C-alpha cells in the first residue's frame, strides 16, 4: 500500500506546477535548487560550453553559427530587441521562481491582479514562446514565420493532461482542429502536428497499462487479452522497478476506457492520414512511457503500413540508458513488418523526478550518469537513424535538439551519406522562441528546420509556459551564445544606423 501511495503521489507531483509556500516568493539556495529539466522539443539535458567557430574558420559541415548578421538578417530590429530581453529574463532563475509562485498563489484569485498578470505575461513571454490563442491564430503565425524566415512550424495544442473522459474527448477535438489548421496551410509551411497521449487518455489508466506491460515482459506467460499488435517497448536494460508485484487485471470499466483512448488516437491518426499531415507523439517519464510507446507503435502499424513515408512518429529520449536498445528493437520490428516508421529524437526531460523516484525505491536512475553519456547516446541514435533514412527505406527522422555540436555532426553525416537535405526524410526542430541561431544556421545549410509552436488561450497556456520556463532554466543558462549573438547584432545595427 505504501508503495502504491508513493507512486500515486509521484504522478500527482509530476504533472503539477512546483508548489511553493503561499506566504511569500521562494528563496533560491544551493540546497533548494532544482535540477533543470527540458521539455517537449527542447527536451535535452543542460549542455556543456560549445566550440563556436570564428568567422574566418571554414567547416566542411556547412553550418555557420558565428555570423550574426547573416543568421538574424530576416529578423526586424524591434523583434530582435524583444527576443533578447525575454530570453535574458527567462535565464534568471529567481525571476522564473517568482513567476511560478505568483501564478500558484491567491493573487490569481482576484480579478484585478489576475488580469494584470495575464496581460503582462501575454505581451512578453506568451507572445514570444506561443503561437496564438487558437488553431487558426497559430496557423497564421506559422505562415508569417515561414514567409519571413523559411522555418516551418509544428503545431502543438498546449494541453498537458486530462483527468476524465469528457476532457479527453474535448482535447481530441482540439487536436482534430489543429490538423485541419495545418492542412489549410501550404505544405511548404508546416511539417507536422504534435499530440500528447496524456491529453487523450487519463494518466491513471496509462500507469495501469504500463504496469501490466512491464509484468508481461517479466512473465511471458502473463497474457493481456486487450493488447493490440505493437513493437517491443522494453529491452534488457529497461527499468522495471515501477512494478514489483503482479498488477490486478484491468477492470471492465478500465478496458472500456482503454478502448476509448485507442479510439481517440486512431481518430487523430485517421485525420492525419486523410490530410497527409505527419503526427508526432510526445514522450513522458518512465512510469507512463511503456503505455505511450505501446499506443504509438500500435497506431503506426495501423496507419503507416503500405505508405512510402510514415504518418505516425514516436519519440525516443536519449537520456535514458535503454534508449539505444529500444530504438534498435523498434527499427528491427518495423523492418520485419514492412512498416515505415518515424522517430523524433530528443535528449530528455524529467531528470530530477526520474532520479527521485528511483532513489525512493532504492533503484538506479534510468537516466545516464553523465551529460556526456547522454550526448553520446543522442549522437549514436542520430547516426543510426540517418543511415536508415539514407538507404531508401521508409524511415522518417526528426532531430529535435538545441545542441550545436549535434547539428554539426548531423550536417557532416548527411554530407558523408549523400542525403538530400530537402527530401523530407530528415529535419531538425527547436522550440519556438529559442535557439534561433541554430535554427537559422541549419536552414542556411540547406536543411528542413521547424519550430515547435504551442498554442492555446492565455489562461490555459500560462501553466504550460511557467513549467517550460521552470524546467528550461538549465538550457537558458547555456543559451548565452545565442543571447551574445543577438546583442552583437543589435550593436552592429545601432552603429550602422548612427553611421
Curated annotation (Swiss-Prot):
Entry's induction text: Down-regulated by salt or drought stress. Up-regulated by proline, hypoosmolarity or rehydration. Activated by BZIP53.
Top-rank taxon, per record: Eukaryota
The UniProt record lists the keyword Cell cycle: no
Enzyme class, UniProt record, top EC level: oxidoreductase
Catalysed reactions, semicolon-separated: L-proline + a quinone = (S)-1-pyrroline-5-carboxylate + a quinol + H(+)
Entry's Gene Ontology cellular component terms: mitochondrion
Transit peptide, residue positions per record: 1-72
Keyword Mitochondrion: yes
Function per UniProt: Converts proline to delta-1-pyrroline-5-carboxylate.
Protein name: Proline dehydrogenase 1, mitochondrial
Organism: Arabidopsis thaliana
Gene: POX1
Amino acid at each position: 500500500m505504501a508503495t502504491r501511495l508513493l507512486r500515486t503521489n509521484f504522478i500527482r507531483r509530476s504533472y503539477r506546477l512546483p508548489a511553493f509556500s503561499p506566504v511569500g516568493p521562494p528563496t533560491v539556495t544551493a540546497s533548494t535548487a532544482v535540477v533543470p529539466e527540458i521539455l517537449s522539443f527542447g527536451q535535452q539535458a543542460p549542455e556543456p560550453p560549445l566550440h563556436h567557430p570564428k568567422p574566418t574558420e571554414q567547416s566542411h559541415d556547412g553550418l555557420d553559427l558565428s555570423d550574426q548578421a547573416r543568421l538574424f538578417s530576416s529578423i526586424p530590429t524591434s523583434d530582435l530587441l524583444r527576443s533578447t530581453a525575454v530570453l535574458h529574463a527567462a535565464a534568471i532563475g529567481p525571476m522564473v521562481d517568482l513567476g511560478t509562485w505568483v501564478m500558484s498563489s491567491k493573487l490569481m484569485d482576484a480579478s484585478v491582479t489576475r488580469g494584470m498578470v495575464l496581460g503582462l505575461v501575454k505581451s512578453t513571454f506568451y507572445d514570444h514562446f506561443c503561437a496564438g490563442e487558437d488553431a487558426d491564430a497559430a496557423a497564421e503565425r506559422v505562415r508569417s514565420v515561414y514567409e519571413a524566415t523559411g522555418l516551418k512550424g509544428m503545431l502543438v495544442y498546449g494541453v498537458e493532461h486530462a483527468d476524465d473522459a469528457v476532457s479527453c474527448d474535448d482535447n481530441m477535438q482540439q487536436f482534430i482542429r489543429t490538423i485541419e489548421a495545418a492542412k489549410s496551410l501550404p505544405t511548404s509551411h508546416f511539417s507536422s502536428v504534435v499530440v500528447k497521449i496524456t491529453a487523450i487518455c487519463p494518466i491513471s489508466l496509462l500507469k495501469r497499462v504500463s504496469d501490466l506491460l512491464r509484468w508481461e515482459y517479466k512473465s511471458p506467460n502473463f497474457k493481456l487479452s486487450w493488447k493490440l499488435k505493437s513493437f517491443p517497448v522494453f529491452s534488457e536494460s529497461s527499468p522495471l522497478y515501477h512494478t514489483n508485484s503482479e498488477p490486478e487485471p484491468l477492470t471492465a470499466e478500465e478496458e472500456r476506457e482503454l478502448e476509448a483512448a485507442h479510439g481517440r488516437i486512431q481518430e487523430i491518426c485517421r485525420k492525419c492520414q486523410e490530410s497527409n499531415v505527419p503526427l508526432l507523439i510526445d514522450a513522458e517519464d518512465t512510469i507512463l512511457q511503456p503505455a505511450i510507446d505501446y499506443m504509438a507503435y500500435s497506431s503506426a502499424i495501423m496507419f503507416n503500413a503500405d505508405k512510402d513515408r510514415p504518418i505516425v512518429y514516436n519519440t525516443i529520449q536519449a537520456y535514458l540508458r535503454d534508449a539505444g536498445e529500444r530504438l534498435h528493437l523498434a527499427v528491427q520490428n518495423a523492418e520485419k513488418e514492412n512498416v515505415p516508421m518515424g522517430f523524433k529524437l530528443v535528449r530528455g526531460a524529467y531528470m530530477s523526478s526520474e532520479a527521485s523516484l528511483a532513489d525512493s525505491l532504492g533503484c538506479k536512475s534510468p537516466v545516464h550518469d553523465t551529460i556526456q553519456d547522454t550526448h553520446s547516446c543522442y549522437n549514436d541514435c542520430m547516426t543510426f537513424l540517418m543511415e536508415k533514412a539514407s538507404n531508401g527505406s521508409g524511415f522518417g527522422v526528426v532531430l529535435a535538439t538545441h545542441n550545436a555540436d549535434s547539428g554539426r555532426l548531423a550536417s557532416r553525416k548527411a554530407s558523408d551519406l549523400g542525403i538530400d537535405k530537402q527530401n523530407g526524410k530528415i529535419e531538425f526542430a527547436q522550440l519556438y522562441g529559442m535557439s534561433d541561431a541554430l535554427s537559422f544556421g541549419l536552414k542556411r545549410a540547406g536543411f528542413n528546420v521547424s519550430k515547435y509552436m504551442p498554442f492555446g488561450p492565455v489562461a490555459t497556456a500560462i501553466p504550460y509556459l511557467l513549467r517550460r520556463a521552470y524546467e528550461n532554466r538549465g538550457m537558458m543558462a547555456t543559451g548565452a551564445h545565442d543571447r551574445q549573438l543577438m546583442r552583437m547584432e543589435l550593436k552592429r545595427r545601432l552603429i550602422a544606423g548612427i553611421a
